Amino acid sequence: LLASSLRRKRLRTFFTVASIVIAFLLFGLAESMRYALQSGVDVAGADRLITMHKVSFTQLVPQSYESRIRAIDGVVDVTPQTWFGAWYQDERNQIPTFPVKPEAFLRIYSDYLVPEDQRLAWVADRSGIMIGRGLADITGWKVGEAVPLRSSIWRRTDGTDLWDVTVRAIYDLPQGGDTRQILMHQEYFEEARGMAKGLIGWYVVKVSDVERADVVARQIDLQFANSPAETK
């Protein structure tokens, strides 16, 4: 009887199931962002701002915003970040993973301790990743090791959720910061993903003067006021 009812009301069933899936996805994104804000990757800091969609961090913003943000007086550097939803072997165990621009990321997060040869190797390999010491200890991954990551959110242009990457660098953080994360190349992510091309999750912005951080933040938001993707 239940199956018969579901068949008769396929559209309603589809939207019901879809709403449940979306609800769980949004919950996962919320938990992920909470983790990012509280973890060793301290997204916002004394000289760092986070710029995201005004409505919600689950709404994406255009990559084209980066050049306009860079042009604002007081901005030193910018990198995009997006929640990747990575998992390895067991989907229940999500690994905080963010596509970034490697060189800009390391300039903004200058406290990341990375051997120079590994830093250069990561920057040079578009499918390379940098992982934290804590994650390396948990997984046993070594520099040079190929890792088949999967994403619970992002499928590739070929329709699969498998992202083959190679560990190129392992970073440490001073004072016991959280090092259980993965940083991957924004260019690789943008080229290979099958949806939402040209959009990113949020920007991390480094400012030249901490005392003017609020002023810079307002200038950034004014740049995109009354646009389809206003920021905050």
Predicted feature descriptions by range:
Residues 55, 60, 72, 135, ...:
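Mechanotransmission and gating elements of multispan inner-membrane complexes involved in transport
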Residues 50, 128, 202-204:
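Short aromatic/hydrophobic contact patches that present stacked aromatics
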Residues 13, 33, 212-213:
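Short phosphate-engaging motifs
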